[in-house]
Amino acid sequence: MDNAAGDQNIDNTVVAQAVAAAIDEIYDRTGQDSILVTHSQGGLPGWEVPLYTDHVAAIVAIEPGGAAAVDSDAYSAMVEQNIPVTFYYGDYIGEEFTDVPAAVMWSMMASSADTFTEAYNAAGGSSTVVHLPDEGITGNDHFMFQDLNNDVIADHIEAWIQENVTE
């Protein structure tokens, strides 16, 4: 499939529909909406999930492969459902890392999160971008949930959930 994210071996829509079906089943069993946590390229189909279910309580995007375009149907669905969104980025994001190609790419992805967040908040939504070093949490790479301080990151995400997700 060739799309805005490049040539991939996955169909983001198929993945989004499968995740939405799982979320709906969880809702049917528990009566609770789900918090969708995505990572990296898994962020791309994650943005589409609200097109297929209205049971997403929040989206936590950990260094996603870009944010939803503000002119997309996925973005509109998130705005309509008032889904709180947060983005998490570890170290090695920013202009000081221009000599590292992967860091340049992730800095561009973080920039798309800033664009999304500005538009989403202006549309009445709630979105934040968390750069862990700005929070005093350092030593994290793209797989921050595997880093030695993953408990600190989990606590930070949990605090965001407690503050932003209502039951």
Model-derived segments and their meaning:
Residues 48-52:
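Active-site signature of alpha/beta-hydrolase-fold catalytic machinery across serine-
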Residues 64-132:
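The feature captures the conserved acid-bearing segment of alpha/beta-hydrolase catalytic domains
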Residues 1-13:
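Cap/lid segment of the alpha/beta-hydrolase catalytic domain
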Residues 37-46:
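Gly/Ala-rich beta-loop-alpha elbow adjacent to hydrolase catalytic centers
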Residues 123, 137-139, 143-167:
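Catalytic active-site module of serine/aspartate enzymes centered on a nucleophile-bearing elbow/loop
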Residues 36-37, 59:
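Conserved alpha/beta-hydrolase fold motif
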Residues 16-34, 160:
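Conserved acidic catalytic loop of the alpha/beta-hydrolase fold
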